């Protein structure tokens, strides 16, 4: 999917089924390396990143069957250096390192790929593994790691909150000798889901969802069954789609408690929000949104993966709104494309200032990453005229059937 035709002047109304969380499913798939037991994982989204992860596992010797629900047997792993042509495609491939080290005592992994969003160093991953007793050599863009015997439990104070590094250390520590404490750990729902999965296999992890996670190492893990949590970012994206178009939507098979900050901001913008056990209903009919001031922060703060969508919302809102990005560098690349569509946006350091206008205009725009792709498609849906969104190959990395789901709620999007 390289290019999309997006018809504008649409009000988006209806019902959407939310897919499983990419950010939980990817690490969970790589965590299967930790055990010889048979595993069944449900609610796996159909995404290119997921498909690449599965290819990586198969390359190592893992047996996998199924589609949305996968049956996985990692008992026959006999390769410890995944190929560069796959590693280079997804940043999540770094999560193979901890499980391979913990179970087999060795791993050789090329530096990973993925979205190019500013500086995303892997130092925190490597420092954590080193503290657990691993010897790591980094040469020619390749991580060569090994440990004699088992990894050793340790108190690890993270110098900054990192979801990725928290996952790496937590996974490696499950099979370490002794106890590990991760202080200043990330608290995201995906961390909780991964810990729940590992505990199902016999790990001993407590505190996931707080800033202090305690892992008591075990000798081995077994098999088990797990259901991946819903994708909170996909949910938030569809809620913004309805809010920006002055429509109404119900998102099904989602988890409202994972979106508290996003729902608060949508309510502040003027939306009527109702929630149930596994659904969220938003109504913005007949109302132009009010502008918002937002600052991204680690969970439970406002998610960085939602700031582009809210920049779109601010662009067509009443008043002046700001968004400050504190997690990643260079995550405002998409704003130049919104400006092409008539948005009035200024960048000042790590903050964008949006001067709301009533209507965007169609244009020929280019997406720079996953969330930018979704944002520009939504912008095309509400703009006047026909918008062509280029480089939408990013989209299938993190949104399952996004154009199809939007078309079901009133959009007119075609693949060119």
Curated annotation (Swiss-Prot):
Reaction(s) catalysed (UniProt annotation) = phosphoenolpyruvate + UDP-N-acetyl-alpha-D-glucosamine = UDP-N-acetyl-3-O-(1-carboxyvinyl)-alpha-D-glucosamine + phosphate
Q: Which gene encodes it?
A: murA
Give a short account of what the protein does. Cell wall formation. Adds enolpyruvyl to UDP-N-acetylglucosamine.
Q: Which GO terms describe its biological process?
A: cell division; cell wall organization; peptidoglycan biosynthetic process; regulation of cell shape; UDP-N-acetylgalactosamine biosynthetic process
Q: Which organism is it from?
A: Buchnera aphidicola subsp. Acyrthosiphon pisum (strain APS) (Acyrthosiphon pisum symbiotic bacterium)
Q: What is this protein called?
A: UDP-N-acetylglucosamine 1-carboxyvinyltransferase
Q: What NCBIfam families does the database record attribute to this sequence?
A: murA, PRK09369.1
Q: Which positions does the record annotate as the modified residue 2-(S-cysteinyl)pyruvic acid O-phosphothioketal?
A: 115
State the active site: 115
A single Gene Ontology CC annotation of this entry is: cytoplasm
Instruction: Return the SUPFAM superfamilies for the record.
Output: EPT/RTPC-like (SSF55205)
The entry's localization annotation reads:
Cytoplasm
What Gene Ontology terms describe what this protein does at the molecular function level?
Answer: UDP-N-acetylglucosamine 1-carboxyvinyltransferase activity
User: Which residues of this UniProt protein bind phosphoenolpyruvate?
Assistant: 22-23
Write down the EC number.
2.5.1.7
Record-listed UDP-N-acetyl-alpha-D-glucosamine binding positions: 91, 120-124, 305, 327
List, alphabetically, the HAMAP family matched: MurA
- Give the top-rank taxon of the lineage listed in the UniProt record for this protein: Bacteria
Task: Copy the pathway line from the protein's UniProt record.
Answer: Cell wall biogenesis; peptidoglycan biosynthesis
**UniProt main location, coarse:** cytoplasm
Give the family per the record.
Belongs to the EPSP synthase family. MurA subfamily.
């Amino acid at each position: 999917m390289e290019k999309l035709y997006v018809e504008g002047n649409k009000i988006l109304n209806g019902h959407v089924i939310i897919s499983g969380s990419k950010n939980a499913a990817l690490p969970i798939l790589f965590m299967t390396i930790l055990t010889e037991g048979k595993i069944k994982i449900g609610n796996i989204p159909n995404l290119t990143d997921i498909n690449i992860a599965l290819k990586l596992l198969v390359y190592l010797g893992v047996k996998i069957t199924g589609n949305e629900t996968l049956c996985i047997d990692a008992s026959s792993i006999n390769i410890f250096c995944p190929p560069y042509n796959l590693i280079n495609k997804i940043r999540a491939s770094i999560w193979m390192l901890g499980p391979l080290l913990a179970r087999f005592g060795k791993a050789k992994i090329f530096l990973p790929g993925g979205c190019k969003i500013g500086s995303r160093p892997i130092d925190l991953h490597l420092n954590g593994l080193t503290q657990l007793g691993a010897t790591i050599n980094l040469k020619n863009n390749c991580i060569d790691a090994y440990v004699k015997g088992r990894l050793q439990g340790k108190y690890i104070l993270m110098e900054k909150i990192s979801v990725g590094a928290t996952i790496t250390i937590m996974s490696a520590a499950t099979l370490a000798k002794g106890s590990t404490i991760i202080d200043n750990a990330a608290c995201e729902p995906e961390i909780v889901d991964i810990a729940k999965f590992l505990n199902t296999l016999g790990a001993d992890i407590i505190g996931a969802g707080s800033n202090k996670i305690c892992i008591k190492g075990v000798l081995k893990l077994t098999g088990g069954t797990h259901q991946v949590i819903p994708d909170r970012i996909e949910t938030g994206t569809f809620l913004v789609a309805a809010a920006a178009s002055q429509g109404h939507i119900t998102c099904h098979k989602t988890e409202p408690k994972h979106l508290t900050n996003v729902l608060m901001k949508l309510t502040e913008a003027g939306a009527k929000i109702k929630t149930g056990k596994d659904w969220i209903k938003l109504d913005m009919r007949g109302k132009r949104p009010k502008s918002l001031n937002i600052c991204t922060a680690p969970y439970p703060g406002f998610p960085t993966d939602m700031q582009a969508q809210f920049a779109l919302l601010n662009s067509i809102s009443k008043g002046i709104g700001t968004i400050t990005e504190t997690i990643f560098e260079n995550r405002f690349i998409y704003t130049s494309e919104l400006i092409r569509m008539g948005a009035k946006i200024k960048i000042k350091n790590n903050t964008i200032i949006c001067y709301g206008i009533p209507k965007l205009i169609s244009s020929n725009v280019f997406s720079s990453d996953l969330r930018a792709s979704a944002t520009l498609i939504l912008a095309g849906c509400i703009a006047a005229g026909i918008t062509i969104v280029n480089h939408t190959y990013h989209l299938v990395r993190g949104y399952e059937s996004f154009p199809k789901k939007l078309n079901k709620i009133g959009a007119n999007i075609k693949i060119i």
